[in-house]
Amino acid sequence: MYLFLSNLSLADISFTSTTLPKMIVDIQTNNRAISYSGCLTQMSFFMLFGCLDSLLLTAMAYDRFVAICHPLHYQVIMNPRLCGLLVFLSILISLLVSQLHNSVVLQLTYFKSVDISHFFCDPSLLLNLACSDTFTNNIVMYFVGAISGFLPISGIFFSYYKIVSSILRMPSPGGKYKAFSTCGS
C-alpha cells in the first residue's frame, strides 16, 4: 500500500511540475510562447505522468479489493513482488502511451521554427498546427486516449463495486464500519 502511495505522490508532483514552472515564468515575463521542442517535451511528460496517475490508482483499487474481499489471503496475493510488478507495468504502459502520442504528432509536417503561443501544450493543439492531413492521427489519438482512460476507470469501478457488495453482505454493523474505514484510508 505504501509503495503505491509513494509512487502516486511522486507521479502527482511530477504531473503538476510539467506545466506549473512554465506557467509561472510566463506570468512573470508576459511571454506565452513555447518552442516546438519544448511543446513536445511538455506533452510527453504530461501524458506520461497523467497516465501513470490513473494506472497507479487502478493498482491501488485492486489492492483495496484484495484487502477487503480476501483479507486472509492479502499477504499471499499482494506480495512485494506483485506490488513492484504492478508499479513497473504502470510506468511501462504510461511510457508507451506517452511515446505513442509523441510518435503520432512527430509524423506530421509542421513549421518547426514557429513558437506556439500557449503555456500548455497538448496533442490536439499540435494537430491543429499541422500542415498535413490529420484525420487518421486524430482517430489514433482519440482511440488510444479512450482506451487508456476507459480501462483504468472500469478497473476502479469494478474493484469498488465488488468491495461495496462484499461489505454490504457483512452481518454486523461493526464489521461494516471497520471495512469501510479500511477502504477509505
Swiss-Prot record:
> Where mainly found?
membrane
Which tissues express it?
Answer: Tongue specific.
PROSITE patterns of this UniProt entry? G_PROTEIN_RECEP_F1_1, G_PROTEIN_RECEP_F1_2
GO BP, sorted A to Z: signal transduction
GO cellular component term of the entry, any: plasma membrane
The UniProt function text for this chain reads: Possible taste receptor.
| Name this protein carries in UniProt | Putative gustatory receptor clone PTE01
Q: Which organism is it from?
A: Rattus norvegicus (Rat)
